[in-house]
Amino acid sequence: MSDEGLAPGKRLSEIRQQQGLSQRRAAELSGLTHSAISTIEQDKVSPAISTLQKLLKVYGLSLSEFFSEPEKPDEPQVVINQDDLIEMGSQGVSMKLVHNGNPNRTLAMIFETYQPGTTTGERIKHQGEEIGTVLEGEIVLTINGQDYHLVAGQSYAINTGIPHSFSNTSAGICRIISAHTPTTF
């Protein structure tokens, strides 16, 4: 990919250009506006996860591929330290992906932290299933037009092919651990 320290917008711009796409064409294919892509690529705003997923789908990349180091170890790691988790979140939502460098993995696990008043943005949709448990605080899961209020100790299981979102409407932090299959991140 590109340099390790490169800002996300700059990396998105490089990827788009490597694929021979104009900003306007990337906007058409992703369903975003040209101005949104321009603003993101200039690193004036940090895109929501759902927005980033739309762009990466056009570029044929998963979130983990986008955020991973370009060089993968020959042997997948067995023990993954906290410092090795891949941060994929933005705008008050931290999503740390447990990734061992195995490109053929079929399961993804994410540690999610939602600051008060934050959300994943517009509804997310990707192939597969997701299960998760609220470890601390509370979260509102919206799926199929229905809001589900979950508190610490409660779990959820959803078909991620149905658009869904998570919102922390409380005054406290919410922490979730979730697993996804297949690995769309």
Curated annotation (Swiss-Prot):
Record carries keyword Transferase: no
Pathway per the UniProt entry: Amine and polyamine degradation; putrescine degradation [regulation]
GO MF terms, alphabetically ordered: DNA binding; DNA-binding transcription factor activity
GO biological process terms, semicolon-separated: DNA-templated transcription; putrescine catabolic process; regulation of DNA-templated transcription
DNA-binding region location: 23-42
CDD domains (alphabetical): cupin_XRE_C (cd02209), HTH_XRE (cd00093)
Domain Cupin type-2 intervals: 111-178
Chain ranges passing through the membrane: none
NCBIfam families named among the record's database cross-references: PRK09943.1
Protein name as annotated: HTH-type transcriptional regulator PuuR
Biological source species: Escherichia coli (strain K12)
